Amino acid sequence: MARGLGEGDPQENDESNGDPPHNTDERSDGDDGPTPYLPVTLLNAGPFGPYNPYCLLGHPVQESGCPGRPTALSGAVGLPTPSGSRSSSHLSTPVGLSAVRVSGCGGAGSEEHVYAEVGSLHSEHEQEGDKCTDCSVTILLLLVIIVLLLIIIGLMLVIMFKKM
């Protein structure tokens, strides 16, 4: 049976009327309108599962997808999960982070996908690059400050000995 213009499944792609495809899931916290989501890749880090890339504190998230090890992030109530069900738990997450539960276990180095709000997180590769750059800049800045302090102390000692 043919469908008329404007009649269609709301989950269909909107490319027919020129609109780009978007996520039509709405949050259950009273937010009106669709919220865009961006897939973010997290890597398992050893036996503790994925870490929260936003805060980089090294604390595993306490949402267990497998016995004995956390393997998922959870965010605001009612976000869509990859399996289609909605997340029903609410963990305290840093401001701006809103991710959903991910099922499955992986060994060290395996990838797991988490959906986060657009703009709240960078990809892990960008963070690692920024982290390395930040460390290099910090170390160079500390070295420059130490060298300047040594030069100032040396000049002060030279001036003091010349006055004597």
UniProtKB/Swiss-Prot annotation:
Task: From the Swiss-Prot or TrEMBL record, state where the protein is found.
Answer: Membrane
Q: Which GO terms describe its molecular function?
A: zinc ion binding
Arranged from A to Z, the UniProt key words for this protein are:
Membrane, Metal-binding, Oncogene, Transmembrane, Transmembrane helix, Zinc, Zinc-finger
The membrane topology term of the UniProt record is: Single-pass membrane protein
Location (main, coarse): membrane
Question: Which Gene Ontology cellular-component terms appear in the entry?
Answer: membrane
Annotated region (Disordered), positions in chain: 1-41
Phosphoprotein as a keyword of this entry, yes or no, is no
The record ties this protein, via InterPro entries, to: Transforming_StpA/StpB (IPR016318)
Spell out where the chain crosses the membrane. 136-161
Q: Which domain of life is it from?
A: Viruses
Zinc finger map (unnamed)? 122-135
Function comment: Stp is required for transformation, but it is not required for replication of the virus. The T-lymphocyte is the target cell for transformation by herpesvirus saimiri.
* Protein's name according to its UniProt entry: Transforming protein STP
- The record lists the organism as Saimiriine herpesvirus 2 (strain 11)
